[in-house]
Regions:
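Extended, low-hydrophobicity, polar/charged segments
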Residues: 1-182
Length: 182
């Protein structure tokens, strides 16, 4: 993984921990970072058992992937979460340590735009106890990622009651929420 970054002219510094950083919450706690700064590397697949097309989603730690949005972004009729075995076979890494780069094969990579809210984000470095810091723009280049809205959209209760406002996940402070009322 470090070599994959070096081939693109980027030096990354891996930080290791005694405790697990397997989940986004564990990583944020260990780093003293915001949950949104943690990059979840999630593997999804499309196709049949003999011809799986892997899709790696780089998602802000506060967000969840919306399968319908991901399928639409990828132009695929059906997408599902990869099993742990499929993720390992398709990337060469186990869940909890899947990095955004350095996989055993080329993957289609989609990046959550909410990661761009931060100067630095933290991504897995190949083990459940290792991460590395990287600016989101550099991450996009390293992973050859397409940035697209793939996160679930949540409905927040309206202060007036009865009506709800659809809010894009992780709206930045001071930035108006997008969506509709109804």
């Amino acid at each position: 993984m470090v070599e994959a970054a070096a081939r693109k002219g980027v030096t990354i510094e891996v930080v290791t921990f005694d405790e697990s950083t397997h989940t986004a919450a564990e990583a944020a706690h260990a780093l003293g970072a915001e949950l949104g700064q943690i990059v979840k590397s999630l593997v999804f697949v499309s196709g049949g058992a003999d011809d799986l097309e892997p899709i790696l989603c780089l998602v802000s730690g506060v967000n969840r992937v919306d399968l319908a949005r991901l399928a639409a972004v990828c132009g695929l009729p059906d997408v599902r979460r990869a099993t742990a075995r499929e993720a390992d076979e398709l990337t060469g890494f186990t869940i909890g340590g899947i990095p955004p780069i350095g996989h055993i094969r080329r993957l289609r990579v989609i990046m959550d735009p909410d990661l761009g809210r931060y100067e630095v984000v933290w991504a897995a470095a190949g083990l459940p106890t290792a991460v590395f810091p990287v600016p989101p723009a550099t991450l996009r280049v390293l992973a050859d990622a397409n940035v697209a809205p793939i996160a679930e959209v949540t409905a927040a209760p309206s202060p007036g009651g009865g009506r709800s406002v659809v809010v894009e996940p992780a709206s930045a402070p001071g930035r108006p929420a997008t969506g509709t009322t109804g």
